[in-house]
Amino acid sequence: MTHDVVFLLDVDNTLLDNDRIADDLRAHLTGQFGAAGERYWAHFEELREELGYADYLGALQRYRADLDENGEAAHRLLSVSQFLIDYPFADRLYPGALEVLQKLAKTGPTVILSDGDVVFQPRKVHRSGIWKAVEGRVLIFIHKEEMLATVQREYPAKRYVLIDDKERILDAVKNIWGERLVSVFPRQGHYAHDPKNAGKYRKPDVTVERIGDLMEMDIGALAAG
């Protein structure tokens, strides 16, 4: 079935305040390892460069190799692992995020379109309540902007609305789908406010200061472009 419109939504810093999650992890690492905890973030950035997405568990595996696991460090490392696995992601949903998903669903199917690993990112989507809110319509890729043919095959539509905090992604998808796409930019998180991105990409079709602002918008008109 080809829908009139399908809504594609990113997760991190679009529906979920991932910057706060990272801040909480940084504080936990510092509490367990002091200044040495910063080595975790060095591995994190290395992996992001290599893989093209944030790999929190992969960075923890690399950080493990830096430690002497014969002592207390082994217990502290498990503490960090439990912190990540048990993190209350639902507490980091942006205000109105689930309500926006419900509102969009009245006009067309809502689909999560995210980058990430195949373990931690799905868990984040599950535990936050997002998975249930979109009825399991979740796609997680390494580079989602390169998987648009798969998106179209799985969720065929005359038009798409992409809601993403990264102007780079919005621009890349607009280059491929053209007028079939309505790009929506929620100005949330560190990517959205990075001055290096100012004027670098084409202006999104719609810009909102926070995801919850979509509750005040006419979704039918938004989908029509």
Regions found by a protein language model. Give the residues of each.
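Asp-based, Mg2+/Mn2+-dependent phosphohydrolase catalytic module
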Residues: 1-4, 126-162, 166-225
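Active-site neighborhood of HAD-like aspartate-dependent phosphohydrolases
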Residues: 1-43, 65
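Generic enzyme active-site microenvironment
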Residues: 8-10, 113, 162-163
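Conserved Rossmann-like nucleotide-cofactor binding loop
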Residues: 14, 118-119, 168, 191
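Conserved SAM-binding loop
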Residues: 15, 110, 162
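A metal-dependent, Asp-based hydrolase signature
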Residues: 21, 32-35, 45-85
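Short, surface-exposed alpha-helical segments at coil->helix boundaries
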Residues: 23, 27, 57, 118-122
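Substrate-recognition element of Asp-dependent hydrolases with the DxDx(T/V) motif
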Residues: 75-90, 97-128, 138-140
